[in-house]
UniProtKB/Swiss-Prot annotation:
Disulfide bonds: none
Gene Ontology CC terms: plasma membrane-derived thylakoid membrane
Pfam families membership: Complex1_49kDa
An example molecular function term from Gene Ontology annotations: oxidoreductase activity, acting on NAD(P)H, quinone or similar compound as acceptor
EC number: 7.1.1.-
Main location: membrane
Self-association and partners: NDH-1 can be composed of about 15 different subunits; different subcomplexes with different compositions have been identified which probably have different functions.
Protein's recorded name: NAD(P)H-quinone oxidoreductase subunit H
Biological process according to GO: photosynthesis, light reaction
Organism this protein belongs to: Synechococcus sp. (strain RCC307)
Length: 394
């Protein structure tokens, strides 16, 4: 009796760019030997819109509404880096009240970003219920953004060079406090529902492991880096905005696997709540209604008309010129280090505007992580990276 030859030639399979489990228009050209992944080549660029060239043909005031389309799950971070770069180059000071408002918007966006990661990630590994829960929480964040900026998800157009577009509306800080009190127990609910679920843990624990050295060598950032034991958070490292005024910890894990990245993001949401509560209590001038009452009571000589109680240093003219010089500035977005290299030549438009997107760099390690795993694990590992193709392709 002859023995049948079971080995076959490797098969090349395309995942995406229209596959429902792809996080945007990403295409993976995967080489398979049976169920085992031999090689993987990510193909990007399907959502390229020339954002850098658009920036180089717009004034800063004109470009801010565009930037929500880089990472459309975290538009506030895009706006922050877009105004931070000219501020630093032109040495524009930001009032403390405006800085506190910025921090509150950024931390709300961090929570919204992690929630939008959590739902689809769990859906990728087979847990459907949390996918619906996360939109319940995000809805409250949308309501806060809508009250302050007029827009709910993207295109808030709220940050300005030297501050923010408008002060917080009456009662906003009270609504923020209600959200913090309501959302804290919801994270505990996620922990009970997900973290110690034996099926979930067996599905992703030990999967897609990245060592500390690999994370550093691949220039990873954000939860991808901190889940491998590197306590690197730009809010602590660069001391930008007013983060030094608050008591909070950098969320880290040591294992470097998909489960560690999940735990880091959950802990980051808890730390963001800490920052939000402290910012709401410590904001210079307090709630807008109290600040305006103090100004009216004390008259024009009131200290509450001082620089630190303003929402913008000075209204930026449409003809604002970016000075000669160059710099690289960065913020800690929900996905990692979001940076901009800006080169000015004393003109209203930048000479060079280079975007350093966190998920673009983090996506580079995907082929390394996928070699040797099963086909079923591809989506779990990709989901743990947290990519938005608008940011990757720009």
């Amino acid at each position: 009796m002859t023995q049948l030859e079971t080995r076959t030639e490797p098969m090349v399979l395309n995942f995406g760019p229209h596959h429902p489990s792809m996080h945007g228009v990403l295409r993976l050209v995967v080489t398979l030997d049976g169920e085992d992944v031999v090689d993987c080549e990510p193909v990007i660029g399907y959502l390229h819109r020339g954002m850098e060239k658009i920036a180089e043909n717009r004034t800063n005031v004109m470009f801010v509404p565009y930037v929500s389309r880089w990472d459309y799950a975290a538009g506030m971070f895009n706006e922050a880096i877009t105004v931070n770069a000219p501020e630093r180059l032109a040495d524009v000071k930001v009032p403390r009240r405006a800085s506190y408002i910025r921090v509150m918007m950024l931390e709300l966006n961090r929570i919204a970003n992690h929630l939008l990661w959590l739902g689809p990630f769990l859906a990728d590994v087979g847990a459907q219920t949390p996918f619906f829960y996360i939109f319940r929480e995000r809805e409250m964040i949308y309501d806060l953004w809508e009250a302050a900026t007029g827009q709910r998800m993207v295109n808030n157009n709220y940050f300005r060079i030297g501050g923010v577009a408008a002060d917080l509306p009456y009662g906003w800080l009270e609504k923020l406090d209600d959200f913090c009190n309501w959302f804290g127990p919801k994270i505990d609910e996620y922990e009970k529902l997900i973290t110690n679920n034996p099926i979930f843990r067996r599905r992703i624990e030990g999967l897609g492991t990245i060592t500390r050295e690999q994370a550093i060598n691949w220039s990873l950032s954000g939860p991808m880096l901190r889940a491998s034991g590197v306590a690197w958070d730009l809010r602590k490292v660069d001391h930008y905005e007013c983060y030094d005024d608050f008591d909070w910890e950098v969320a880290t894990a040591q294992e470097g696997c998909c489960f560690a990245r999940y735990r880091v993001r959950l802990q980051e949401m808890r730390e963001s709540l800490k920052i939000l509560r402290q910012a709401a209590q410590q904001i210079p001038g307090g709630p807008t209604e109290n600040l305006e009452a103090k100004r009216q009571l004390e008259g024009k000589d009131s200290e509450f008309y001082g620089f630190d109680y303003q929402i913008v240093a000075k209204k930026v003219a449409p003809t604002f010129k970016i000075p000669n010089g160059q710099l690289y500035t960065r913020v800690e977005s929900g996905k990692g280090e979001l940076g901009v290299f800006l080169m000015g030549n004393n003109d209203v438009t930048p000479w060079r505007w280079k975007i350093r997107a966190a998920d673009f760099n983090n996506l580079q390690i995907l082929p390394h992580l996928l070699k040797g795993v099963k086909v079923a694990d591809i989506m779990a590992i990709l989901g743990s990276i947290d990519v938005i193709m608008g940011s990757v392709d720009r």
